[in-house]
């Protein structure tokens, strides 16, 4: 249990989620410190900036449960020196999800789950609610912020290994249920069952995308509201006007016009995410004019359609690594840059996902002006497999395999928007390319 009279010690504090949680707890007034591998990582910068002590792993860091609350990262097992010290000293630990659940119970809490759109929707909701009332948040891109006395807690709920079943929020947005994480979930039914369990644990209301049949099939004892573009949706986006600066649209709440909203974001998925945010805010009786203002000042989530301008070349960085996400990102790029050649640099993420979605990836990349595929990013769980980037490229006319040693080939693409997409270490390819511009 969290305790302001004890030190909150993180084993693995540099992990993206752990660093976010450590920052949030520090902001809420807890005494936070932790340890990790010696290698310098970007996640430790904000921690050190606010004075959180980040040490190397050392058994001596572990004291006792009288002095410390230990939060252990999922990746660390008994061969870790501090985990071993906990076992030897009889010191109990709690997990990241256990700790987040404690924060969930302290607030009016909203979880955002789904295969795609979690980070973007969590970022937007935390931003607009933060314009209205004190709001703490935890986002999957490594950002966490706590506000003492906060009314709302907005968090990204990750379905991998059913982690989100640790949480019992007041509200939950579910963006979609497309089968993912084939290394853990057996099949679509197994994957969908995790979301049914998450729905069962939601207390006040569930908000689901109206076009997703699996979301429609979820059974709940609480109100389940749909959002989308159809007349049958409880919260419907209508009168949509798209431009190169974003999108304007009205939202009907159970038929009542809530007025026009504007977002400086691109693609249908961004309008859907915004409609889900409006639905939650409306249900919580947050003034719509405040939400309108918050939408206008939102600049987007990290690594979600992040743009840079290099004269006639625009560079977009996006986390997309599943076919649905890739299609959404490509649609958004066409909306923002209708007159530019569309070039995609795609890093397949894990061998199991690449094998499962090979035909989808090939179909999507055949539809852009030029496609490059990097070597497959191997995760720690899955070091190799029987598929390669060459297998994709041979089925995509005009495409090429690209690596750091031939990254200069990208400079041939004049008057282009170049989209780097992937969930692994694709930023290293983008960085190498940008140094040539």
Swiss-Prot record:
One GO CC term, this protein: cytoplasm
Superkingdom of origin: Bacteria
Entries under Pfam families matching the protein: Mur_ligase, Mur_ligase_C, Mur_ligase_M
Residues annotated as binding ATP: 114-120
This enzyme's EC code(s): 6.3.2.8
Alphabetically ordered keywords of this record: ATP-binding, Cell cycle, Cell division, Cell shape, Cell wall biogenesis/degradation, Cytoplasm, Ligase, Nucleotide-binding, Peptidoglycan synthesis
This protein's record includes keyword Cell cycle: yes
UniProt-listed GO biological process terms: cell division; cell wall organization; peptidoglycan biosynthetic process; regulation of cell shape
Signal peptide as annotated in the record: none
Major subcellular site: cytoplasm
Catalyzed reactions per annotation: UDP-N-acetyl-alpha-D-muramate + L-alanine + ATP = UDP-N-acetyl-alpha-D-muramoyl-L-alanine + ADP + phosphate + H(+)
Enzyme class (EC, first level): ligase
Associated pathway: Cell wall biogenesis; peptidoglycan biosynthesis
MF terms in GO: ATP binding; UDP-N-acetylmuramate-L-alanine ligase activity
Cellular localization per UniProt: Cytoplasm
Family under the similarity heading: Belongs to the MurCDEF family.
Function text: Cell wall formation.
Protein name: UDP-N-acetylmuramate--L-alanine ligase
Source organism per UniProt: Lactobacillus helveticus (strain DPC 4571)
